[in-house]
Amino acid sequence: MLRKLFLMVCAIAIPLRGLAPLQKALYITTEPPIKPYEALWRAVSMVESSGDSLAYNVSERATGIVQIRPILLRDYNARTGSRLRLSQMYNPKISKRVFLYYATKFHYSDYERIAKKWNGSGYKTEIYWKKIKKQLQKQVKIN
């Protein structure tokens, strides 16, 4: 009886041995992070500067890929305790940090409100939002 049981276990286990991995290893994969504002960031970048991180608007002293003005940077520095300079806004990573601060701080769930607030106030924000929407729609077609 014991011998039959042993033979049955061997009959089942030996073929399965070919299916088991030879190395004993655990593989852990990570999913890419969720970036809820990435599409909006790209759209604003295209509308503000055509994606040019070295863009500069002389009349407004707006700097970088998303055209950050001195008054906005002063507000950001005051709120966060940072000491960023306008010249650093040519670096897209730093500009993005400033942009994301405002996107997440005030209107995190609504792209339209974020975009309009980024642009300013008044009726021209409607025109601006239409440009942003157009860029967002282009991204959807590409992706």
Regions found by a protein language model. Give the residues of each.
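Short charge-dense sequence patches
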Residues: 42-58, 81-90
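Short, functionally critical alpha-helical segments immediately adjacent to catalytic or ligand/cofactor-binding
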Residues: 35-52, 68, 99, 113-121
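N-terminal, post-signal-peptide region of Sec/Tat-exported proteins
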Residues: 53-81
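N-terminal secretory targeting signals
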Residues: 1-36, 143
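Alpha-helix initiation/capping motif
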Residues: 30-33, 58-61, 88, 92
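Extracellular/periplasmic catalytic domains that process cell-envelope and extracellular macromolecules
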Residues: 34-38, 59, 109
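Alpha-helical segment that forms one wall of the substrate-binding/catalytic cleft
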Residues: 70-139
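Cell-wall glycan
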Residues: 27, 47, 66-72, 139-143
